């Protein structure tokens, strides 16, 4: 009985320590569009805007706004990071090389792009699993475009909103200089809409 109680106390203590462990973006690594390992600890002290992207989406023109933000504020500490993904309407069918060329030629993208990966499901990259565990889905808002997105996804799955994961291309996560997620923005929120919140963190 004593041993069982002792083991129970030890297990509870270990669980408490594990649950209290503070995870930041700096604990993760990813593969770049060029196939190189990216250690996110290298971004310590930066404000990060992490976005899942696609080349053939109605939201693809947001690349313009993302690049504008990056150019305007990179010298003050902002880094925009794109994660191409083909999970939503198969709107990112290209190879990593084709994606890079598309972004550069059509939108002049100079901010970092990661290798194409899943952001939901069994094969989701660990960064996005962590991002949406920190900031779960909380709705598209009351704008006309938000209602349109809600209607579209509800037709496919009436319970879609109960899951914390990514709902569509160009979901954005804003992280502070300590690597913590401070806000999540759904695709209907444009890069221009984020500027004041980004500036507040710089």
Per-segment meaning from a language model:
Residues 19-41:
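N-terminal "domain-start" segment that seeds a small globular fold
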Residues 46-47, 55-56, 60-84, 103-107:
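Conserved helix-turn-beta segment immediately C-terminal to the redox Cys motif
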Residues 182-202:
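Non-catalytic, surface beta->alpha helical segment in thiol-disulfide oxidoreductase systems
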Residues 1-7:
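Bacterial N-terminal signal peptides that target proteins for export
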Residues 108-188:
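Thiol/selenol-based redox catalytic cores and closely related redox-interacting motifs
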Residues 11-18:
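Hydrophobic h-region of N-terminal signal peptides that target proteins for export
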Residues 77-94, 109-121:
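Thiol-based oxidoreductase modules, predominantly thioredoxin-like and allied folds used
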Residues 25-26, 48, 169-171:
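Short loop/turn microsegments at loop-to-beta-strand junctions
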């Amino acid at each position: 009985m004593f041993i069982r109680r002792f083991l129970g106390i030890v297990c509870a203590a270990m669980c408490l320590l594990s649950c209290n462990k503070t995870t930041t973006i700096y604990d993760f690594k990813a593969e770049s569009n060029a196939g190189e390992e990216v250690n996110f600890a290298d971004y310590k002290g930066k404000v990060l805007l992490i976005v899942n992207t696609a080349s053939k989406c109605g939201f693809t023109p947001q690349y313009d706004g993302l690049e504008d933000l990056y150019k305007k504020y990179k010298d003050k500490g902002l880094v925009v990071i794109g994660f191409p993904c083909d999970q939503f309407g198969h709107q990112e069918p290209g190879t990593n090389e084709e994606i890079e060329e598309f972004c550069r030629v059509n939108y002049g993208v100079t901010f970092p792009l990661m290798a194409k990966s899943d952001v939901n499901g069994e094969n989701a990259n660990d960064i996005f699993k962590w991002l949406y565990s920190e900031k779960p889905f909380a709705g598209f808002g009351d704008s006309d475009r938000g209602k349109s997105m809600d209607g579209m996804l509800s037709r496919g799955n009436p319970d879609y909103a109960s899951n914390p994961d990514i709902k569509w291309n160009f979901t954005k996560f804003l992280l502070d200089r300590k690597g913590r997620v401070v806000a999540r923005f759904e695709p209907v929120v444009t890069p221009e809409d984020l500027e004041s919140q980004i500036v507040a963190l710089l």
